[in-house]
Amino acid sequence: MSEDAVKNAILIAGPTASGKSALAIRMAKATGGFIVNTDSMQVYGVLDLLTARPSRADLAEAEHFLYGHVPPSSTYSTGKWFEDVEALLGRCELQGRVPIFVGGTGLYFRALLGGLSQTPEVSAQVRDHWRGRMEAEGAKALHAVLCVRDPAIAAALQPSDSQRIVRALEVLESTGKSLLEWQKVKGRALVDDQSAQKIVLRPDRAWLGERIARRFSAMWAEGAIDEVRALLALDLDPALPAMKAIGVREVSAFLAETMSREEAIERSVIATRQYAKRQSTWFRNQLGEDWRVYASGEEVFQGGSFRDPQ
């Protein structure tokens, strides 16, 4: 543990649509704390609705940081998020207050508690080489290359995950070592693992599935089409993370008149449910036993299980 690691933090993890944001606001009001985004998609601008960022009403109830601060034309890494959190925690006006980290990105929580893996920088020449090959040959072809050169990490990556495939190849060529080996070398933590309150929401699967369907229908009604239209107007590289947000492809197909409204909503709901399942599986398998599991945010406050860390 780093000597300057925050000792009064609250961490709230869980799948999308599980009620994390409402719980974070309630805790912020109870503790006088502030909320820090711990979700890799909610950092991007433009997609307020599709990434389920806090509403204007939510923002009025508690201070929120690191939401929508990254242009969708950028690629934002776990390392950059770590740097932004470190700078945020160092701000004088926030000293002594409770930081409440809330989101669904497991790697962000891992970075907070275990420190960020010390992966190396790669040269521009190596980066340009592999990104050029990715553009020319595609993700599946480079995944096949990775299967030969580094089968262990290739097995852990989806053949369509172009960003991580390129990163693995870059690191291997630059250092002669697998990215998996570099990931074992940990840096410092920003949050003290022992004193942090660690909460993971694990709602009933049927309840979550229904909530996801209702929420996406509401997103559509509230302006998700306009968000995607604005995103497409930027003429961005389809490989950028913001372009891969759930709902972007489906709404784009609707706008192009190649998919009906009903099918676009149905496919988006299915994709969101699948994503929630992957998140739940990751949290179940990767988080330590000291994370307290609750079915809902309301349950956290029942029976006196919540304690003010101040």
UniProtKB/Swiss-Prot annotation:
Its cofactor is Mg(2+). The keyword Nucleotide-binding applies. Pfam families: IPPT. The record marks 105, 127 as: Interaction with substrate tRNA. Gene3D superfamilies: 1.10.20.140, P-loop containing nucleotide triphosphate hydrolases. Residues 39-42, 163-167 are annotated as: Interaction with substrate tRNA. GO terms for molecular function: ATP binding; tRNA dimethylallyltransferase activity. HAMAP family: IPP_trans. This is tRNA dimethylallyltransferase. It comes from Brucella abortus (strain 2308). The lineage of its organism: Bacteria, Pseudomonadati, Pseudomonadota, Alphaproteobacteria, Hyphomicrobiales. The gene is miaA.
